[in-house]
C-alpha cells in the first residue's frame, strides 16, 4: 500500500487537493434522504406533530440553507425529491413571525393529480371545501392542497400554541 509520505511532496499535495474537491463536491450534490417521505410526507398530511424547528433542522441538514425567507417561511429547494410518486421542488417551513406553525411543499403536479397520487399511495381522501374555480381541498387531519400557479401546494398548518397565562399575583396583607 502506498502512503502519501512515499510520494513526492508535490504529488501528495495534488492528491490531497483532489480528494478535498471530491468531498466538497459530494457535499454540494446531496442525495435526498431515505427518510424524506416519512418525515416530510407525514408532516404534510398532518400525521405528525408540527414543529417548525424540527422541520427546519431536518431540511437544513438534508438540503443545505434555505434559498429564501419570504411570507413568514423559510424556503428550501428539494431537487430530486418525490412524495407519493410526484416530484416536489420546494419545501417551506414557518418562521416564528407567523401565527401558524406549518410545513408545506410545492408539487410538480396539479391539485387533481396530487390528490389522486395521495389516494393511491396512502388512501387519504380530500374534500373540496369551496366552490371556486380553484377549490381548496382538505383532508380530515387538516392537510390542504391548493393551486400554486400551474402546480399545487400541499401544507399542514396549526395554530401556534400560546404560552400559558400566569395567574395574577395574589396580594397578601402585611401584619
Feature names for model-found ranges:
Residues 18, 50-51, 158-161:
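Extracellular/secretory pathway and lumenal proteins
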Residues 24-26:
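N-terminal signal peptide c-region/cleavage motif recognized by signal peptidases
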Residues 31-91:
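N-terminal secretory signal peptides
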Residues 119-175:
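A charged, solvent-exposed segment within the mature domains of Sec-exported extracytoplasmic proteins
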Residues 77-136:
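Long, charged/polar, surface-exposed segments that mediate recognition or autoinhibition
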Residues 2-15:
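Bacterial N-terminal signal peptides that target proteins for export
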Amino acid at each position: 500500500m502506498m502512503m502519501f509520505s512515499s510520494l513526492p511532496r508535490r504529488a501528495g499535495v495534488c492528491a490531497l487537493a483532489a480528494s478535498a474537491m471530491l468531498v466538497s463536491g459530494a457535499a454540494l450534490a446531496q442525495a435526498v434522504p431515505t427518510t424524506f417521505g416519512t418525515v416530510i410526507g407525514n408532516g404534510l398530511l398532518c400525521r405528525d406533530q408540527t414543529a417548525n424547528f424540527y422541520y427546519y433542522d431536518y431540511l437544513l441538514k438534508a438540503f443545505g440553507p434555505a434559498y429564501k425567507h419570504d411570507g413568514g417561511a423559510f424556503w428550501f429547494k428539494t431537487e430530486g425529491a418525490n412524495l407519493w410518486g410526484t416530484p416536489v421542488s420546494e419545501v417551506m417551513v414557518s418562521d416564528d413571525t407567523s401565527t401558524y406553525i406549518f410545513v408545506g411543499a410545492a408539487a410538480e403536479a396539479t391539485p387533481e393529480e396530487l390528490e389522486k397520487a395521495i389516494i393511491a399511495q396512502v388512501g387519504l381522501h380530500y374534500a373540496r371545501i369551496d366552490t371556486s374555480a380553484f377549490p381548496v381541498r382538505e383532508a380530515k387531519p387538516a392537510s390542504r392542497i391548493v393551486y400554486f400557479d400551474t402546480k399545487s401546494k400541499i401544507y399542514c398548518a396549526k395554530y401556534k400554541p400560546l404560552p400559558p397565562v400566569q395567574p395574577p399575583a395574589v396580594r397578601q396583607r402585611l401584619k
